[in-house]
A protein has these predicted regions:
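Hydrophobic packing residues within well-ordered alpha-helices of enzyme cores
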Residues: 29, 53-57, 167, 171, ...
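Conserved acidic, metal-coordinating active-site core of Asp-based
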Residues: 105-218, 222-230
Length: 271
């Protein structure tokens, strides 16, 4: 068992890890999460926007830093920006035009800072995403007007599994300087090439004056592997993909729906 005194910071993926199968926070885990957050920072590391993470913190009653858009936008516990890595506007406009032309059957959401725009809020895929992340999009095609020269943090591609696999391959080939990763079989995230969860972990460790050896991290998907590899004590959820379990140092005995992160943290830090 890991020594509780050696753990100084916690990193956790969100969907498939920190929330239930409906992608919503589990109230029963709140008391444990609050007790842990009183001792060490709990950092949510997710492909979600800040607005997709705030409701989780609010529902469980804790505060902490956020690594949004898979590490492209990192905020401290007071909401101050620690890192912003964007796709320049000119590139973003080219990417959006390419997606509309070559992949018209894919639904695209565009995210930057605290803004999420879509072509149509009545698109069933957008409606589903709004429900899952408890955030609201804005109908707009005006990337330049919405984001300006600050650029965008990510494009979210939504579609059927075979189409998303094809989209990831096509975007990676057409824009090799970008990062295109599937966060599920129906979602692909497209971000600047230097974006990674592990980079956010390193930055937040430095910000809090701790080392990766003093960190614990939880994840379930392939896009969590680099984060799990960046810390000493890494945990794959019971529901994690096989490759993730191989990459992690430990396995949580419980799934996300069984409050696995909270129960593991209770053993590690409150036991």
């Amino acid at each position: 068992m890991v020594d509780a005194e050696s753990i100084k910071i916690v990193f956790s993926d969100v969907d498939g890890t920190f929330v239930d199968d409906e992608h919503h926070p589990i109230p029963e885990s709140g008391a444990i999460i609050r007790a842990v957050a009183d001792r060490v920072p709990i950092c949510l590391v997710s492909a979600r926007s800040p607005e997709g993470l705030y409701p989780i913190q609010q529902a469980l009653g804790f505060n902490g830093p956020l690594a949004c858009y898979s590490g492209a936008y990192v905020l401290d516990e007071e909401g101050n920006e620690l890192l912003s890595s964007t796709i320049p506007l000119a590139d973003a406009l080219e990417i959006k035009a390419y997606l509309e032309r070559e992949l018209p059957h894919i639904t695209v959401g565009t995210y930057g800072f605290h803004t999420w725009i879509v072509d149509s809020r009545s698109d069933p895929r957008i409606m589903r995403e709004e429900y899952l992340v408890m955030a609201t999009s804005k109908a707009s095609r005006d990337l330049a007007g919405e984001f300006g020269e600050r650029g965008v943090h990510k494009f979210l591609l939504m579609g059927e599994p075979k189409d998303i696999l094809q989209a990831q391959q096509m975007v990676s080939e057409r824009f090799p300087h970008l990062t295109a990763v599937r966060s599920s079989d129906i979602l692909c995230e497209v971000m600047a090439g230097d974006v990674s969860k592990s980079r956010a972990v390193q930055l937040l460790c430095e910000h809090y004056g701790v080392t990766p050896e003093q960190a614990v991290a939880f994840g379930d998907g392939q896009n969590d592997i680099d984060m799990l590899s960046a810390v000493e004590q890494s945990y794959a959820m019971a529901n994690a993909e096989p490759e993730v379990k191989l990459a992690a140092a430990h396995e949580v005995p419980w799934t996300n729906a069984e409050c696995g992160v909270a129960r593991m943290l209770e053993q590690l830090l409150l036991g």
